Each structure stands twice: as C-alpha cells, then as structure tokens.
From Swiss-Prot:
Protein name per Swiss-Prot or TrEMBL: Biotin carboxylase
Pathway: Lipid metabolism; malonyl-CoA biosynthesis; malonyl-CoA from acetyl-CoA: step 1/1
Lineage: Bacteria, Pseudomonadati, Pseudomonadota, Gammaproteobacteria, Chromatiales
Assembly and oligomerization: Acetyl-CoA carboxylase is a heterohexamer of biotin carboxyl carrier protein, biotin carboxylase and the two subunits of carboxyl transferase in a 2:2 complex.
Cofactors required: Mg(2+); Mn(2+)
Recorded catalytic activity of this chain's protein: N(6)-biotinyl-L-lysyl-[protein] + hydrogencarbonate + ATP = N(6)-carboxybiotinyl-L-lysyl-[protein] + ADP + phosphate + H(+)
C-alpha cells in the first residue's frame, strides 16, 4: 500500500493515539508511541511496536517538547510523524521542524498551517476562493477611529472584536452599540498583546443565535480535493463541543453540494493536502466561514460512519504520496451518526475528575462504536484534557441513531471517577435536541449556565 511509510511516530496520547495506531496497523505500518511519565500505561503505548518516554507529565515538557519528539523519531528510525489533534497538530513551526529533520509530517504543508492559523489571512484566502465569510473589517483595524466607526455601521451591530492570534473562545468581545466600540477595541488589543504577543484585532458581524456546521475535506498532493459532507456541532459548553452529528439536520442536498464544492475548491486554490475541516456559523439559511482546522478532528467518526471513508487512513495514504482513492461522486451520505464526548468530570461543576477507573464496561450492539483508551484499572491523569472517550452511533435515520445512543449510554459503565454520561443522557432526551437544529447557545441555556 504505502510503500514509503514503514513506520509512524504518534505524537499524541489518549483515544486519538489509539485511533492512529489502529489505522497504521491496518496499513501494515509499524508504530512508535511517545509518552510522558504519567502515560506509561496508556493503551496505545502498550500496543505500539516501540515506545519512547519523552519527558515528565506536564505537556510543556512532553507532548509539546519538540526536540524530545524529533529525537525519539531519530532513534527509532521513524519515517512519518502523525500529530493527532491538539498539542502540536496546528503548530506550523513543528511541521517545519519535522520536514527539515527529514521526516514526513502527516498533515498540511507548514505554510498552509500558518496561512489558516492566522484568522485574518485565513479569511482573506477564503474570500478569494469564493467561500462565504462573516461580513467584517477585511483585515486588521487601524487607528483611524472615524473609519472604524463607519465600518461598524456598515457591518451592523452587534459586532464581535476578535484578536488575530486568538481562538477557542479567547481574545474576543461582543459590542452592542457604538458607544462602547472604541473602548472594546482598545481592551481586546491589550489582552491580545499580553496573551498572544500579537495586538492585531479585527471586527466582524456577531451572529446572535447561529448553529455550528463544519465541512470535512480531503486533498491529496496532486491537487485533487473532495468534501465528505457536513457535521453539526452546535451542542457546546464554553466553546467546547459536547455532541456532534452528521449530516446536519435541515441542511439540503443543494446547500451541502454548494458549500462542500466551495470548500473543495478552496483546498485546491491554497494547495491544501491531507484532512481538514472548514468551520461555519449558520444562521437564517446562510453559511459564514469562521476558521479552518488543519488536522483531524475529535468528531471525525460521525463523518466516517455516514460516508464509509476512513479519514485517518486517508491522512496516512495522502502523506505517503498516494492519490485520493475517492472521487466526489463516490461520496454518499448514508443514514445518520451521532457522537457523544465522554469526559471525566463532575456532572454538576464540570470540574475534571481524574483518578482510577475501578470498573469499565463498553456498550455494544448494531451501529455502536466506541473510541476510548480507558480500561478497568486505568488511572486518568490530572495533567491533560478531561475527555476519556467518544461514543458514536449510526442508524438508518436520526431517530434510530438517537435511540441507539440512548441504549449505548445506558449500557456504559465507568466506575471510580465521575463522568458526564448523565448529561449526555439528558441531552438525548431533550425536546429541542430531538427536534434538531438547536443553536450554539442552547446547551448552556438548557443547563441554566
């Protein structure tokens, strides 16, 4: 299959590291697991062909420690490095170091990561490629106050001030009237300079009640690009996704084709390679591009379930220089899939709940998939993200996917630590969720936050 990649180093941990290991195994590729001192007992570390400890528990000293990861790749004769999601996956400097050190980076080119990582240049690139964007300042705001106020009137209030280097809900501020605009810009600038070392800010229309809908794309190194349809990730708490599904309720075949084609065309125009996701806000029938994730996403399984495409395997094959194995006409959405993220956290306070899992039982049955690295006796460390797994169900339609999810959540047993399974069960029974098409603020309202 991929003649040139004999060995992959997995620069990540937890469920995604295990997911990557399984894809490598299927392709007959040897694996190297790098891990922190706290992660010696991770499932993929125990399963990998080789493992290398790269540092102490804190991520800064291990999973974000570039020299340690590169030297682990060197001592194991690794051919390619898969960054997973989070950690170094969208770090252009890391991708560059990987390639300069003679390894294949399983992801886009460093310059593409850089282009899409800067919100201002990303939006400019997407506009040029014909992807619909949120009306805004078309670049950073300058010091001309009169022009800034005029522009804000044109866009229309409410307006969001965003810092160019921010993300994940940080470095942004909503302004409802002209009176507070200039002050808000100054505050956001100061915060951005302190947090991201970059005081560039821009403004865009603030959509009051949008849904979060994203499109999955795949592009090879020969300039071919396709989209795999959309996912709805509107069930969020504090900008963190909780439930994701594919396809998005109420999106028409025309909309899917139009926006999906534009995303694929944008990939071709920026020379994208690998798997990627275009995130949109969707309100009143309109899509507005917000950002592109240049990596595999947590919620990729829902797209895999409805399209039958193994996204992680495709990432590896693309990195090996293989052409895409699918044409756009091969991609059909079949049925409906839902994913619930399972977190080790207190159901009421949402505080992380690390500790030893004394008992774990995974659900089963038709159309049920679980992606998790936990097992009975495994200790969830306190140093990393609280997500310990993902439960995915697939059914012939949304109703049957939900019914299967309800069963799967009921069957899942995780003892010894707290989890958000109770929350997920209540979402699956919630009227607005069952109706489909809830907006991104709905879950916080439902929880009374």
């Amino acid at each position: 299959m991929s003649a040139m990649i004999e060995k992959v180093l997995i620069a990540n941990r937890g469920e995604i590291a295990l997911r990557i290991l399984r894809a490598c195994r299927e392709l007959g590729i040897k694996t190297v697991a790098v891990h922190s001192e706290a992660d010696r007992d991770l499932k993929h570390v125990l399963l990998a062909d080789e493992s290398v400890c790269i540092g102490p528990a804190p991520a800064m000293q291990s999973y974000l420690n570039v020299p340690a990861i590169i030297s682990a790749a060197e001592v194991t004769d690794t051919v390619a490095i898969h960054p997973g999601y989070g950690f170094l996956s969208e770090n252009a400097d890391f991708a560059e170091r990987v390639e300069k050190s003679g390894f294949i980076f399983i992801g886009p080119r460093p310059e593409t990561i850089r282009l899409m990582g800067d919100k201002v240049s990303a939006i400019a690139a997407m506009k040029a490629a014909g992807v619909p964007c949120v009306p805004g300042s078309d670049g950073p705001i300058d010091d001309n106050k009169k022009r800034t106020l005029e522009l804000a009137r044109e866009i229309g209030y409410p307006i969001m001030i965003k810092s160019s280097g921010g993300g994940g809900g940080r470095g942004m501020r909503v302004v409802h009237s002209e009176a507070t605009l200039l002050n808000a810009i100054a505050l956001t600038r100061a915060e951005a300079a302190a947090a991201f070392n970059n005081d560039m800010v821009y403004m865009e229309k603030y959509l009051e009640n949008p849904r979060h809908i994203e499109f999955q794309v795949l592009a090879d190194q020969m300039g071919n690009a396709i989209h795999l349809g959309e996912r709805d990730c509107s069930m969020q708490r504090r900008h963190q996704k909780v439930v994701e599904e594919a396809p998005a309720p109420g999106i028409t075949e025309e909309q899917r084709r139009e926006i999906g084609e534009r995303c694929a065309a944008a990939c071709r125009s920026i020379g994208y390679r690998g798997a990627g996701t275009f995130e949109f806000l969707y309100e009143n029938g309109q899509f507005y591009f917000i950002e592109m994730n240049t990596r595999v996403q947590v919620e990729h399984p829902v797209t895999e379930m409805v399209t039958g495409v193994d996204i992680v395997k495709e990432q590896i094959l693309i990195a090996a220089g293989e052409p895409l194995r699918y044409r756009q006409s091969d991609i059909q959405m079949r049925g409906h899939a839902i994913e619930c993220r399972i977190n080790a956290e207190h159901p009421e306070t949402f505080m992380p709940s690390p500790g030893k899992i004394t008992d774990f039982h995974a659900p089963g049955g038709p159309g049920v998939r679980i992606e998790t690295h936990i097992y009975s006796g495994y200790t969830v460390p306190c140093h990393y993200d609280s997500m310990i797994g993902k439960l995915i169900t697939h059914g012939e339609d949304r109703e049957s996917a939900v019914a299967r999810m309800c069963n799967a959540l009921r069957e899942t047993v995780i003892e010894g630590i707290h989890s958000n399974i109770k929350l997920q069960r209540s979402i699956m029974r919630d009227g607005a969720f069952l109706a489909g098409g809830a907006n991104i603020h709905y879950l916080e309202k439902m929880l009374g936050l």
